[in-house]
Curated annotation (Swiss-Prot):
In bacteria which possess the bifunctional enzyme ornithine acetyltransferase/N-acetylglutamate synthase (ArgJ), ArgA fulfills an anaplerotic role. This is Amino-acid acetyltransferase. The lineage of its organism: Bacteria, Pseudomonadati, Pseudomonadota, Gammaproteobacteria, Pasteurellales. It is found in: Cytoplasm. NCBIfam families: N-Ac-Glu-synth, PRK05279.1.
Amino acid sequence: MRNTELVQWFRQSTPYVNMHREKTFVIMLDGNAIAHPNFINITNDISLLHSLGIKLVIVFGARCQIDELLAKNQMSSTYHKHIRITDSKTLEVVKQAVGGLHYDIFSRLSLRLPNSPVLNVVSSNAVLAQPLGVIDGVDYGLSGKIRRINIEAIQQQLAQDAIVVIGPIAPSVTGEMFNLPFEEIATQIAIKLKADKLIGFCDQQGILDSEGNVLSDLHPREAKRYLTQFIESGQYHHSAARFLQAAIEACHAGIKRSHLLSYKEDGSLLQELFSRDGIGTQLSEESSENIRLATSFDIPGLLNLIRPLEEQGILVKRSREQLEMEISNYTIIERDGIVIACAALNHYPQEKMAEMACVAVHPDYRDSSRGDVLLEAIKRRAYKLQVEKLFVLTTRTTQWFQERGFVLSTTDDLPKEKREHYNYQRMSKILILDLGQ
């Protein structure tokens, strides 16, 4: 990364640093993620999150390590409904695998980065288990499910600035140990903690569409369709499918956002959390984008958006004072709290006309439909004001407006006040849309 790119990335990430501080994230790591060479980078990034004031719970699984140890001991496993049936001999292997991963995670997180403090990493026995029992005539043995979670104990550890690590085995009230699906543990802890995010590291960069492109945002309703595809194609064993199911459940239970990332790509955690569009798949009941009327708090974001366009001569220069006086005229699109598009509606009630002005879209989003979204929002505001004609003055985007029904006009068609202040040096094209009211 060149110095200029580093500076730009660091500046763009600053709002997210402030946004995430003091928030609680639950991170799911399966055995494949821990075994991968990139795991050391993942733990370094987790340490960085902790240094930024983020509260972290790590829940890990050990399926691939368990399978390797079973094969080494010439043992095999039986599954029913994607759950391992655990007998007493298998449980000994499970405990061995989980213990080894516990050590690996603690040792990696204990590696100090230069000029950084030693992390307080703790193991938690906050999960109490109970047997799954007999289902469909199948005895699951020592495979279990959650009976209770001592969420207060986890909260106390987080309050003491600790990273909490929890594995996939837990005791019962009778003292027996049970093998639990770690995705279930992570999901339920996130729900009971009222965590801000559930993050899963899986074997691909989120959820992919039919052409192999990453879906950056998914509503749980859409996510269910992809989960069904995983199941019907016999791919539920993939971590992406299991994590997707966990994310859907978490979203339905009130977790605002869940993220699916690849454990294979260096820096995926940081790119997902500290950039506008991320790198993996985000699940949310609500869109990360919001269109609304601007307030005075949006002025710094508006200035950042329109200043480059003013310097290029695309927009007329506006002072901060002018924006403050006219802020109620503006409609904005924000993404993760950052203004990425705007437009103003200046009303001329005597002529029943209005101007769509100061139309700006962030460069990263100009190939999308944000301009159309803004236009529709401005038209809705105009209808409420009983505006009959909407006009724009533009030097660069004449065709775009013509494609949407605007017709080239002259200064004679402008409201009197606007006509008197028309800038003949800029020679902006005048286009008018008949709203048919």
